[in-house]
From Swiss-Prot:
This is Transcriptional repressor OPI1. Signal peptide: none annotated. The gene is OPI1. The keyword Endoplasmic reticulum applies. Present with 1281 molecules/cell in log phase SD medium. Interacts with SCS2. Transmembrane segments: none annotated. Its main location: endoplasmic reticulum. It is found in: Endoplasmic reticulum; Nucleus. It comes from Saccharomyces cerevisiae (strain ATCC 204508 / S288c). The FFAT motif is required for interaction with SCS2 and proper localization of the protein.
Length: 404
């Protein structure tokens, strides 16, 4: 063993000590004797100021002081030995160290980027899972609310059908009253008494209640349609895939056009039958009037003229567009039917989407179960193979021991 190893010194410490010794010797050689120092002290201040120090002396003194401070710091364990090596090495060595540090920096940066990308992928998977769960919940709630809207619209449709039937019954009294008021100038007292008797059976409160009920039903139908629109736009905007979303959008946008077309193409046959019934009743009344009032020919002629005008007006109403024969309640009834059809279409789209999603989840679960079963089978086979290998090796070891 060498002396340095015995003392426990490393090669770097030995080199630093040698450098320090060389620098100290150079400092002693350059230092002036004590006599020169005393003479320099005795010299006047003007002369001392005029003799400047050499530049090399200044630089060497700075280098020596820096090296001494570094050596002291090494002894006190304040700075590692690598600092001295970096200061004393050449420019090439410093360049090599810099490149090495750059490589380490880039490797660390790559590791950080890879970790960030992996973390982002995990977060994206979790976000997709949460989005799928939330979209499923939204679609389920939307389907439940659409079923409630479907039930409400079906109830309103039945109510509107009753109101339309009542409206088709009540106009008979109004038309008969109007016809009789127009022909009242040519009728006698007996016909006026019959009109009074007929008007006594007509109840106006029923008409008022029917009108109020129709207004309430109309408001409820319109409010239900608005709620359905807001509900679909809220729950199915980001939850449905693209083909289903386009189908829902198309069904929503086609509701006004479908309602308009159905209103202008719908003809209520009940009105025509009522018109024919009115004509037959008027003919019977004319025959009775002719039998009773044979003497009043002039009045009968006026009645015939008026009846012809009424027939012309009624024929014109029948030949007019079918939308003129549709009442307000009939239009609301058509709106409710079209809205009900739209709701059913949206329900079908949402239900089919949920069914496809459930089938996809089942397929994924089946694939995972298959992979898990295969993995377990492979593990069992591997363990059995290990057991066979171990049973085969053990007898050989026993035989070797017995031979020994």
């Amino acid at each position: 063993m060498s002396e340095n190893q015995r003392l426990g010194l490393s090669e770097e410490e030995v080199e630093a000590a040698e450098v320090l010794g060389v620098l100290k010797q150079s400092c002693r050689q350059k230092s002036q004797p004590s006599e020169d120092v005393s003479q320099a002290d005795k010299m006047p201040a003007s002369e001392s100021s005029t003799t400047p120090l050499n530049i090399l002396d200044r630089v060497s003194n700075k280098i020596i002081s820096n090296v001494v401070t570094f050596y002291d710091e090494i002894n006190t364990n304040k700075r590692p030995l690598k600092s001295i090596g970096r200061l004393l090495d050449d420019d090439d060595d410093e360049h090599d160290d810099y490149d090495y540090n750059d490589d380490e920096f880039f490797t660390n940066k790559r590791q950080k980027l890879s970790r960030a990308i992996a973390k982002g992928k995990d977060n994206l998977k979790e976000y997709k899972l949460n989005m799928s769960i939330e979209s499923k919940k939204r679609l389920v709630t939307c389907l439940h609310l659409l079923k409630l809207a479907n039930k409400q619209l079906s109830d309103k449709i039945s109510c509107l059908q009753d109101l339309v039937e009542k409206e088709q019954v009540h106009p008979l009294h109004k038309q008969d009253g109007n016809a009789r008021t127009t022909t009242g100038a040519g009728e006698d007292e007996t016909s006026s008494d019959e009109d009074d008797d007929d008007e006594e059976f007509f109840d106006a409160s029923e008409q008022v209640n029917a009108s109020e009920q129709s207004i309430v039903v109309k408001m409820e139908v319109v409010g239900t349609v608005k709620k359905v629109y807001s509900l679909i736009s809220k729950f199915t905007a980001n939850s449905l895939p693209e083909p289903a979303r386009s189908q829902v959008r198309e069904s929503l946008l086609n509701l006004p056009t479908n309602w308009f077309d159905s209103v202008h193409s719908t003809s209520l046959p009940h009105h025509a039958s009522f018109h024919y019934a009115n004509c037959e009743e008027q003919k019977v009344e004319q025959q009775q009037q002719q039998q009773q009032q044979q003497q009043q020919q002039q009045l009968l002629q006026q009645q015939l003229l008026q009846q012809q005008q009424q027939k012309r007006n009624k024929d014109g109403d029948d030949s007019a567009s079918p939308s003129s024969s549709v009442t307000a309640n009939g239009k609301v009834l058509i709106l409710a039917k079209e809205s009900l059809e739209m709701v059913r279409n949206v329900m079908g789209v949402v239900d089919s989407t949920l069914g496809k999603a459930e089938e996809w989840v089942k397929q994924k679960q089946e694939v995972k179960e298959m992979i898990r079963e295969r993995f377990l089978q492979q593990q069992q086979q591997y363990r059995q193979q290990q057991q066979k290998d171990g049973n085969y090796v053990k007898p050989s070891q026993d035989n070797v021991d017995s031979k020994d």
